[in-house]
C-alpha cells in the first residue's frame, strides 16, 4: 500500500476521526461488547453496522458537547464529515433508484462539498460498485 503524501492529507477532521474510531467510538464500543459475558456469544462478536456506525457518529457530536475539539477548525472538520455523509445519501439514492449517471453523481458532489475531484470520483465509483 502506498504511503499517502502527508502534505496533501486533510488533518482538519483528525479529532472527529479519533472520536469516531477510537474512544469513545468503535474501539471503546467493541471492547465493551466483547468483554460483556452476559451477552450471548453471537451478540458479543458480530458486527451490527447500523448500531456500530450510529454509535460512532454520535460520539463525534460528543466532541462539541464535552468541549473536546481543540479549535474551531477541528469542529469544522466534524461538520464537513456530516455534510459528506448527507451527500453520500443523496448520491446513493440518485445512482441506485433515480437513474443518475456517474457524471451526474460526480457533479452533484462537486457542487456540494469541497473535496478534490479525484476523491469524489473514487467515492462515486465505489458507490456504483456496491
Protein language model features and the residues they cover:
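Long, His/Glu/Asp-enriched segments that create or flank divalent metal/ion-associated functional microenvironments
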Residues: 1-130
Amino acid at each position: 500500500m502506498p504511503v499517502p503524501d502527508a502534505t496533501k492529507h486533510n488533518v482538519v477532521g483528525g479529532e472527529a476521526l479519533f472520536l469516531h474510531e477510537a474512544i469513545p467510538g468503535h474501539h471503546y464500543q467493541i471492547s465493551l461488547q466483547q468483554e460483556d459475558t452476559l451477552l450471548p456469544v453471537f451478540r458479543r462478536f458480530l458486527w451490527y453496522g447500523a448500531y456500530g456506525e450510529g454509535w460512532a457518529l454520535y460520539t463525534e457530536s460528543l466532541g462539541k458537547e464535552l468541549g473536546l475539539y481543540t479549535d474551531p477548525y477541528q469542529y469544522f472538520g466534524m461538520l464537513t464529515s456530516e455534510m459528506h455523509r448527507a451527500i453520500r445519501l443523496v448520491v446513493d439514492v440518485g445512482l441506485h433508484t433515480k437513474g443518475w449517471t456517474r457524471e451526474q453523481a460526480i457533479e452533484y458532489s462537486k457542487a456540494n462539498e469541497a473535496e478534490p475531484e479525484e476523491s469524489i470520483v473514487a467515492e462515486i465509483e465505489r458507490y456504483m460498485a456496491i
